[in-house]
């Protein structure tokens, strides 16, 4: 996978068109303005990196174990589908913003379907955050190790109230702020 910095979807798609007939090379994540992730066959990802370099575009190869969020993950999605098809999902108490569609979902059958699709589909993080902002979501909490998503939210919405929770101390601090 390749992180492309300082470029937008259209520019990257134009570069991908030059090599796509050779195999799989797809936008995997639309993270934030100027941060797009591409996934696919490693040879094509390397070729794309060379094309981007020729066009004076910055990119960084990501040390990942698989080409996530692209059609090369179809077999993994099929496996996931078979694993969860007999699992009962309840209706959530709150709508979930699906990263596949960047829209709300609360139907258990649809959630299950989207959990499978997210394995091979583009992550629409920027669109998801913009959807939430347009629907009056004002506080963004990232729960888990790291602060990558918090940083992406701030790139999308510079004035957003966003923070990350990485420890018990962070939970106490967030609770005291509320």
Residue spans of the language-model regions?
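Acyltransferase/transacylase module recognition
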Residues: 88-178
């Amino acid at each position: 996978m390749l992180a492309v910095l300082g470029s937008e979807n259209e520019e990257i798609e134009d570069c991908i068109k030059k090599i796509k007939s050779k195999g799989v090379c797809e936008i995997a994540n639309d993270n934030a303005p100027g941060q797009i992730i591409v996934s696919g066959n490693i040879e094509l990802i390397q070729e794309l990196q060379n094309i981007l370099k020729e066009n004076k575009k910055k990119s960084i190869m990501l040390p990942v174990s698989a080409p996530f969020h692209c059609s090369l993950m179809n077999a993994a999605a099929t496996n996931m589908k078979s694993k969860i098809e007999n699992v009962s999902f309840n209706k959530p108490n709150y709508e979930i913003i699906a990263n596949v569609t960047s829209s709300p979902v609360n139907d258990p059958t649809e959630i299950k379907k989207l959990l499978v699709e997210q394995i091979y589909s583009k992550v629409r993080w920027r669109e998801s955050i913009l959807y939430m902002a347009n629907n009056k979501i004002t506080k963004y909490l990232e729960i888990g190790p790291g602060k990558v998503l918090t940083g992406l939210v701030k790139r999308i919405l510079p004035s957003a109230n966003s923070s990350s929770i990485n420890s018990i101390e962070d939970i106490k601090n967030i609770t005291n702020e509320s």
